[in-house]
Amino acid sequence: MKASMFLALAGLALLFVVCYASESEEKEFSNELLSSVLAVDDNSKGEERECLGFGKGCNPSNDQCCKSSNLVCSRKHRRCKYEIGK
């Protein structure tokens, strides 16, 4: 009787440890996943801030308009505009 009670308690303790370990791994995984998603969002925001969009004020000597969108800084208007013909 004492042996069976001891085995039952040991089994419950082992089950508790295994469940707790798997639950903490799931939490770590979800935290890592969430932090990686947020890191991707932060990187995309950083890229958006590096260049100026259409119609934004700019300095022709330091052209910061988005080259990927074919924008250049107009010397006349000092605004980002689309470059036509290139």
Swiss-Prot record:
It is found in: Secreted. GO terms for molecular function: ion channel inhibitor activity; sodium channel regulator activity; toxin activity. Residues 1-21 form the signal peptide. InterPro entries: Huwentoxin-1. Its main location: secreted. Expressed by the venom gland. Residues 22-49 form a propeptide. Disulfide bonds join 51-66, 58-73, 65-80. GO terms for cellular component: extracellular region; host cell presynaptic membrane. Coiled coil: none annotated. Keywords: Amidation, Disulfide bond, Ion channel impairing toxin, Knottin, Neurotoxin, Presynaptic neurotoxin, Secreted, Signal, Toxin, Voltage-gated sodium channel impairing toxin. The modification Isoleucine amide is found at residue 84. Belongs to the neurotoxin 10 (Hwtx-1) family. 22 (Htx-4) subfamily. Neurotoxin. Selectively blocks neuronal tetrodotoxin-sensitive voltage-gated sodium channels (Nav). Does not affect tetrodotoxin-resistant voltage-gated sodium channels or calcium channels. Monomer. The presence of a 'disulfide through disulfide knot' structurally defines this protein as a knottin. This is Mu-theraphotoxin-Hhn1c.
